[in-house]
Amino acid sequence: MAGVLLVFYLDGFVLGAPVALLLVWALLGVVVLVGFLRHAVHGPAGRVQWPAVALAALAALGVLVLTRGASASAVLATALVGAAGGALEAAGRSRQRWQGVAAPVYCGAFAGMTSQLVLGHPSWVVLAGGLAGLVLSVLSDSWSGIGGKLGTTAFLGVVGVMGLAVAAGAMGSGASLHPFTAVERSLVLILSLLSPLVTHALSYRLGLGVVLGSALPSILLAILLGALPAALQLEPVPLSAAWLGASFVGMTAPERLAPRPLPLLLAMGLLFALLSFSFAPRLAGIGGDL
């Protein structure tokens, strides 16, 4: 996993960066890698949970139906599918039913965000969702309580399937990123600072769980931004994606943030915003790259 993320980091931030920023990104990458390895807390590899594989594949399909079939935004579709999984798990909690459903559903939904310009045929994306569910079940005892694990796992699933797509000649040219205006950059910064705080409070203080804590506000924000008048010249999808991505920070468990959760959440949200501004991969549109 660390190797794949290193390639992702090099592609997204280091390659093609101005000389003045190369050292900054290189040093930051080393810090991130050290922290990643230090806090991995690897347990034994888990067994492949086939229900989790099926749920993740089904979730990816659900996002495809909403985005490619119903023209919903990728953020709204992903949050809706994730919220459905979270609600199902919450509804069965009292009777100990449907436990463990939310995580593979949300993970598969992230894989389903993959652009049609990357993996054109839906079957590739569904396969990526299933692979993400498989990886998630195997790594069930690794990186526990670290926000972003589900998205990272989805990214690994998509990258794995991309290798097959390249071999089959079915790989797309990739999507293009939205260039933020000055106003949008300010909004991304604000959203990236607020989202972790809201997500963490809903997830742990109110006891909704991390999936609902991330998905429910993301649904609301995606709807509100989509309803803004065109005269404001704000692109709702990149802004709502910033909120969704920053919400992964807020999914981090309290014990990982002790004894100063608020400063850490704000610092991580700020770092997320700065990374969002500089993210310029050769191939955009991969599910899980938030």
Per-segment meaning from a language model:
Residues 37-40:
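Non-catalytic propeptide/linker segments at domain boundaries
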Residues 1-34, 44-57, 72-79, 86-170, ...:
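C-terminal transmembrane helix-loop-helix hairpin of multi-pass membrane proteins
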Residues 61, 65-68:
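N-terminal, Lys/Arg-enriched amphipathic/low-complexity engagement segments
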